[in-house]
Amino acid sequence: MYRQEATTVTILAQAPPNWPAPAFDISGFTSAFRPSRRAQRSNTTMGSIDTNSTDAWHTFAIPRLGIPAMRITDGPNGARGTRYFNGVPSACLPCGTALGATFDTDLLFKLGRLLAAECKAKGAHVLLGPTINIQRGPLGGRGFESFSEDPVLSGNSAASYCAGVKDLGIVPTLKHLVCNDQEHERIAVSAMVTERALREIYLMPFQLAIKNARPGALMTSYNKVNGLHASEDPGLLNHIIRKEWGFEGLIMSDWFGTYSVASAVNAGLDLEMPGPTRFRGPALMHALTSNKVSEKTLDDRVRKVLELVQLTSRAGIPEYAPAQKLDRVEDRVLLRQAAADSIVLLKNANEVLPLDPRKKTLVIGPNADIAAYCGGGSASLLAYYTVTPRQGIAEKCEEVVFSQGCYGHKELPLLGDHLKTETGERGYTFRVYTEPATYEDRQPVDVLHMTNSCAFLMDYSHPKISGDTYYATLEGRFEPTESGVYELGLTVAGTGLLYIDGELVIDNKTKQRHGTSFFGIGTVEERGERYLEAGRQHHVFVEYSTAPTSNLKHHGVVSFGPGGVRLGGCRKLDAETAIKQAVQLAAETEQVVVCVGMNGNWESEGFDRPHMDLPPGTDNLVRAVIEAQPNAVIVVQSGTPVTMPWADQAKALVQAWYGGSEGGNGIADVLFGDVNPSAKLPLTFPRDIAHNPSYLSYRSERGRVLYSEDVYVGYRYYDKVKQAPLFHFGHGLSYTTFKLSGLNVQETDPQASDISAEVVQIYVRPPTTASVGRPVRELKGYEKTMLHPGETKEISVTVPMGVATSFWDEGRSAWLSEKGTYAIEVVGTGERNMLSAPLCVQVSRYWNGL
């Protein structure tokens, strides 16, 4: 029974910390970057142009003034360094939704420190993360990057992440401001959203992160918001972010997300990315001389760039430092913990889990023998290593049997790692030319040995290549382990031909089709088949030409340089036979794990999913296995919700996300009880896409998308209309039973590990007398605590009064904490594990700011 006097939930207002003063005075520098009148007359351009970027990842260095270059790197789940193409590997964290599922601010802080250490190893001063957009629907291509559909969970997670990054002197970047919640026509679409929804849902994560962590940088989104591109919206950048919230950091554009000269500068956009500049060279000089931009405004923009360079100099990272590997043992341990702590136990009827490592275990499914460790796009990462679910389970079990069941790939698995060069090295030879294949006696200007057969050329450069038009070949030898018909795939942003043993197998040059590859500028994967013999080395050769040689035209997408080429392939699988084999083994095996889901080809920047379904054939496999072995454990890997038409029949069901480098070990740790599952869903999982509140207004139509659900995003909608989803926000089971009393949390029924974690969620219900329609309840705070068997702990969760009670009053353009009796609900693991108490607000109060 809840006793009001025993509660330790504290509701209070908190003042933001002060922004640290600069280490040295920069006021005298700004004039050096402003074109002087004499310089204008002599047609020289000084400084304001110099404070922009030189390439995709660096700002200008100005040695005469002692101003160093600053290196910027992607991304939210790992520090890539300066190269997509043939880059240096890095540690890969679980995806954003996985981290949101942990509800663990301490873990996010530690992971932020890991990211900062990786940045230092890569010579980077600024990290482009975290991503804190809102998943208003399940189909967003970048939904996996963000933490949650809930703004408080998202903002608090971001604050802890940023604090960890800052702890080692690296500058985190909040992105993407704002409403970058879909990929369809992302540079052209206008998000039409009410001011109330903008404030309460979409800006709130940024507001909380800025208040609690003071990150040094912020990135604008590609899209428009109510008709104005975010990068040139003065109401958003100057009024809300700078004046109302007091943000002192730098505001940069997303890559090629600057669309104007004067409008962007006047709105408050400090840095155009990437370089060389399109809008801040002679065009900015012209805007200055024509009084479209004032000298003071330009000084303000320059000052912010200098302040950030100054701030990053404290980290002691040399200019243009070579990228290095880190890969420390302690980082592997932390990544494994993060992977396990992010896994949500959705169902566990009859206590099927945890599994017994002494028993023979059958592992089935398309995701069992691959590492679906990250989503696609700018969040993709070349990891130091990856662990598949099958590998993780094999480390636990005495006997493991594998059956494929079906394939789950959208594009064929990369072939590069299975090729060999002429000298027998693993991989293939990549040769670059300035002349096309028709040119006689052409010689390569560059020869590289590579293993990754997805070559995205955005940041490839060579002294002998000018412009984006050039040519390349990929050459290697493939020796199959089994004879049979193999399917090959060639995807290009450009044009390409694939030859096997001298014969043309794929023509992706003369007749091309639009696809979603390479951020939406590439083709579909064109496929061809060929019978290949085991033990024989087959010659594989790709003739590739860069993007300008293609006649395909694209609308509403970002063009990242010269394009790319992707080569995939695998043995063709008879779907019916593969399922039958898996089912037969399942019927004969007591302990069965089915690993299904998506990967970075299905969920990626550059496009949205057309539906919520799992890859073709997956549902048939799962149904058949459950029928043969009802105790089969179903493990789903996806960054956002998927349909599970067999969920009611499954006894044990686990949501495992994209778990980063240690994803396979994390899955095994939870399945076998070495880690007690404690994660909670950061997203609502609907039964069907039609049940989602954004269903009728998600994609761009005639250049706009209407946020018709208003503030009723995610669980706020399902609560309001009293519709039960498949799995609700905040759901997550444990192998242990917990009990709340007051805010004393007790572990009463330990079944697995000696230590268990419980997440306590704090929701607030508005007064019945509220003057506007409000969500039934909203998450306002949470706490994760560790417990030994039988232990009782008292938890204190502090929630600012404004965050707890306020809504945005559009009539007053202010927050309103309205008088009335609110209800605080404290929710633990289990449907009935809940406490409640009233909270009385005696006087209505308007407020602005943080």
From Swiss-Prot:
Coiled coil stretches, renumbered: none
Catalytic activity reported: Hydrolysis of terminal, non-reducing beta-D-glucosyl residues with release of beta-D-glucose
Residues bearing carbohydrate: 43, 52, 508
Residues annotated as catalytic: 254
Subcellular location: Secreted
Keywords: Carbohydrate metabolism, Cellulose degradation, Glycoprotein, Glycosidase, Hydrolase, Polysaccharide degradation, Secreted
GO MF: beta-glucosidase activity
Superkingdom of origin organism: Eukaryota
Stated role: Beta-glucosidases are one of a number of cellulolytic enzymes involved in the degradation of cellulosic biomass. Catalyzes the last step releasing glucose from the inhibitory cellobiose.
Family stated for the protein in its record: Belongs to the glycosyl hydrolase 3 family.
PANTHER family: BETA-GLUCOSIDASE, BETA-GLUCOSIDASE J-RELATED
UniProt protein name: Probable beta-glucosidase J
Upper taxonomic lineage: Eukaryota, Fungi, Dikarya, Ascomycota, Pezizomycotina
Gene (UniProt): bglJ
